[in-house]
Amino acid sequence: MAAAKFTALLIAGPTASGKSALALRLAEKLGGILINADSMQVYRDLRILSARPSAEEELRAPHRLFGAIDGAVNFSVGLWLEAARNILEEARQAGALPIFVGGTGLYFKALTQGLSDIPAVPDDIRAKLRARTEGVAATELHAELSARDPLMAARLRPSDPQRLLRALEVLEATGRSLASFQSRRGPPVLDPAATRAIFLSPERAALNLRIDERFEAMLASGAWAEVEALRRRGLDPALPLMRAHGVPHLIAHLEGKIPQDEAIRLGKRDTRAYARRQFTFARHQLPGFVWAEPREAEALALA
């Protein structure tokens, strides 16, 4: 078994770039514990649609935080970071290399740069705001935020309803701009000098094709049944899992609201758009990561 020259390994990248397969090979070679850094793979409901490792793959190396959380839970970055700290201690005591793998840039940013201490938003405030803004266009949310919190509005895209709602929730709950909390960060969990961080960067056209093909393969392998089971749970549509890529459109088809081919087209479109955002986030928010073609990444990690 090879010996690592670092105390933690981070494998990030866009969806469908081959992160999980690479991380598993490296865990086998380096004696690693795989720690999930994907905000959808933490949930147990959608193994297929979230591309979570299979049960057979999970037997090949220790896996942590994969399918660990019920879909009814709003599992925040702070909760994930707390769990990650505990697993890091487990890895150290076992003499195993912690290997973080996933596509959620915010998780990696929290690990390597620290996390802002943002107060929890009470459920009643969140529910009232969600009810008031249901069906409201993202551009209208941005206009409201611009009027009430221009500093934060300037940082957010008018096409990003999730982050716009988050900014409005914090404003409602605290009377303060989310920007004021983001300016104060706790210390990073990992020492950047002792961490190897890699961002997989496949060629864009090939990645888009792989995304489309994988989405079709997921549907053929049982994703429809997964989504139907999730739909029957009657969870709040605002929960993170209910907004997973493809889920709203597949549910819309299952409820007879849109044709099947339209649901599939929109699911693929949203996943490709997510991949573009992952590239953008990494470029601007993850400065310590080395970008590598997938075929070069294993050698880079082992060097």
Curated annotation (Swiss-Prot):
Name a GO molecular-function annotation: tRNA dimethylallyltransferase activity
Query: What is its cofactor?
Result: Mg(2+)
What does the entry list as the binding residues for ATP? Answer: G13, P14, T15, A16, S17, G18, K19, S20
Task: List the Pfam families hit by this protein, alphabetically.
Answer: IPPT
Report the enzyme's class at the first EC level. transferase
Q: Which BP terms in the Gene Ontology apply to this protein?
A: tRNA modification
Q: What is its EC number?
A: 2.5.1.75
Q: Gene3D superfamilies of this UniProt entry?
A: 1.10.20.140, P-loop containing nucleotide triphosphate hydrolases
Q: Which residues bind substrate?
A: T15, A16, S17, G18, K19, S20
> Entry's InterPro entries?
Dimethylallyltransferase, IPT, P-loop_NTPase
Spans annotated as Interaction with substrate tRNA: 38-41, 162-166
Q: Which residues form the signal peptide?
A: none
Which key words are in the record?
A: ATP-binding, Magnesium, Nucleotide-binding, Transferase, tRNA processing
Q: Where is this site: Interaction with substrate tRNA?
A: T104, R126
Question: What's the catalysed reaction?
Answer: adenosine(37) in tRNA + dimethylallyl diphosphate = N(6)-dimethylallyladenosine(37) in tRNA + diphosphate
The highest taxon in the source lineage is Bacteria
Q: What does this protein do?
A: Catalyzes the transfer of a dimethylallyl group onto the adenine at position 37 in tRNAs that read codons beginning with uridine, leading to the formation of N6-(dimethylallyl)adenosine (i(6)A).
Matching PANTHER family: TRNA DIMETHYLALLYLTRANSFERASE (PTHR11088:SF60)
Subunit-level organization: Monomer.
Return the similarity comment. Belongs to the IPP transferase family.
Q: What is this protein called?
A: tRNA dimethylallyltransferase
Supply the source organism for this entry.
Methylocella silvestris (strain DSM 15510 / CIP 108128 / LMG 27833 / NCIMB 13906 / BL2)
